[in-house]
Amino acid sequence: MKKLLIGASLAALSLVSLAEPVSYTIEPSHTFVTYEIQHFGTSTNRGRFDKKEGSVQVDRAAKTGRVEIKFELPSVNTGVAMMDKHLQSPDFFDSAKFPTATFVGEQFVFDGDKVKSVTGNLTLHGKTNPVTLTATNYNCYENPMLKRQVCGGDFDAVIDRTQWGIDYGLAYGFPKNVHLVIQVEAVHQ
């Protein structure tokens, strides 16, 4: 009887541990925060933020999670130094005054074990607004080099930059909508 109780207790404990959130740290070399915006209707301007960090907690059994991704606005990289400097100015990001942007998502939608979307708040340019990032790809796998589980995917949203007080160029015909893409891979801790 005693062995049966010990076995049942261990089984119950293992089920509890399966239902707890699993923590991941974002892998910066496999994570990219990028944006795309139309340029006078002729082409698409693209940029990325080279410095970023963050963490993810996921409880697949409870279908819950939390993600926090912080990116440094002075690290904007369009491939054109003059444009990078202008984007850091008060016309756009005002990165001297607002050096970081942060997305914190706490509403996860799952389809089975796969994350389909994450809703949270994006703080940018001193303002916070809700954003839903939709997964276009999501997977978890056992990384053969790290010997740990890695989860990640591609998430995107179209945001109205004027909600964050970034309205430079509207009078010239620049659109207010920006395609935000967050490609993330995170390593189990």
Spans of features found by a protein language model:
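Sec-dependent N-terminal signal peptides
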Residues: I6-A11
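Positively charged n-region of N-terminal signal peptides that target proteins for export
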Residues: M1-L4
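N-terminal signal peptide c-region/cleavage motif recognized by signal peptidases
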Residues: S14-S17
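Low-complexity, acidic/polar, glycine-enriched regions of mature
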Residues: A19-Q189
